[in-house]
Amino acid sequence: MTRRNQTAISQFFLLGLPFPPEYQHLFYALFLAMYLTTLLGNLIIIILILLDSHLHTPMYLFLSNLSFADLCFSSVTMPKLLQNMQSQVPSIPYAGCLAQIYFFLFFGDLGNFLLVAMAYDRYVAICFPLHYMSIMSPKLCVSLVVLSWVLTTFHAMLHTLLMARLSFCEDSVIPHYFCDMSTLLKVACSDTHDNELAIFILGGPIVVLPFLLIIVSYARIVSSIFKVPSSQSIHKAFSTCGSHLSVVSLFYGTVIGLYLCPSANNSTVKETVMSLMYTMVTPMLNPFIYSLRNRDIKDALEKIMCKKQIPSFL
């Protein structure tokens, strides 16, 4: 019966967000504003880095790729969510669901690896400033970016192919606002052991190890700065690491809690809210925390704005 159901299924029904109907328009406006902010913030970063030659450095190479990953990561789920919030029967085609899983994993993993590269870049810049250019050579930076893209491609493809092997009952209802992998496993009609094993085995090198490397990098940064005891050095340590670590902890904390350490007590509402944190909030905050507060980015933006204003006075 599962084989018949698997071939017959053409779409999934999404329950969406657990909000009262009377607040639907309010949350629609809120999520639309958040999505547009995410698009605008990340597009500004990418354009500025492309146009300003002074930003053609290792750190901004990683930043531009991270902005692209965040922009696409948010676009994987947000447009469909906004569309379904205006639909009487929120659904997603079977092929669209698999595509959403693939790109969700791809851009999520890509941002994950880029955060590690950025943490390492800051570590070298602060702890080994005299050797920064020799260590962070263009060849190494490009290699790190290419490696990130390659690893994410294979990881996302593996999980997508494993999901495609599963059988689903007709009229399958997903208690989520997108095709979340862990939620799909709960509604599958066939054995999900291989999928769960792949998540557990690959979760370490893909999620936990990068998180630990980021923590170690920032810990070394703080330790290096504290070797020169002064109020200025302490302020520099917190300004350099505090805001970055808060977003990193928010992203990794929710991902690890949802996928690597799932609890039987986790309700659908709790899982949905946790998912909102890393699918909406983190991509929106990253441009402000990593780039828009940066003096180089502000200078580049001011130069472009001045160039556009000068012809109007001529």
From Swiss-Prot:
- Which Pfam family name is an example for this entry? 7tm_4
Residues listed as glycosylation sites in the UniProt record: N5
Q: What is its main location?
A: membrane
Q: Which InterPro entries match?
A: GPCR_Rhodpsn, GPCR_Rhodpsn_7TM, Olfact_rcpt
Q: In Gene Ontology terms, what is one molecular function of this protein?
A: olfactory receptor activity
| Transmembrane among keywords | yes
Q: Name one GO cellular component term.
A: plasma membrane
GO BP terms, alphabetized: signal transduction
Subcellular localization: Cell membrane
* Transmembrane stretches, start-end: 26-50, 58-79, 101-120, 140-158, 197-219, 237-260, 273-292
Cleavable signal peptide: none
Q: Which Cys pairs does UniProt list as disulfide-bonded?
A: C97-C189
Q: Which UniProt keywords apply?
A: Cell membrane, Disulfide bond, G-protein coupled receptor, Glycoprotein, Membrane, Olfaction, Receptor, Sensory transduction, Transducer, Transmembrane, Transmembrane helix
Gene3D superfamilies assigned: Rhodopsin 7-helix transmembrane proteins
Q: Which residues are exposed on the Extracellular face of the membrane?
A: 1-25, 80-100, 159-196, 261-272
Could you say which tissues express the protein in this record? Olfactory epithelium.
In which domain of life is the source organism classified? Eukaryota
Q: Which residues lie on this side of the membrane: Cytoplasmic?
A: 51-57, 121-139, 220-236, 293-314
Task: Provide the function of this protein.
Answer: Odorant receptor.
Question: What family name appears in the similarity comment?
Answer: Belongs to the G-protein coupled receptor 1 family.
Query: By what name is this protein known?
Result: Olfactory receptor-like protein I9
Query: Which species is this UniProt entry from?
Result: Rattus norvegicus
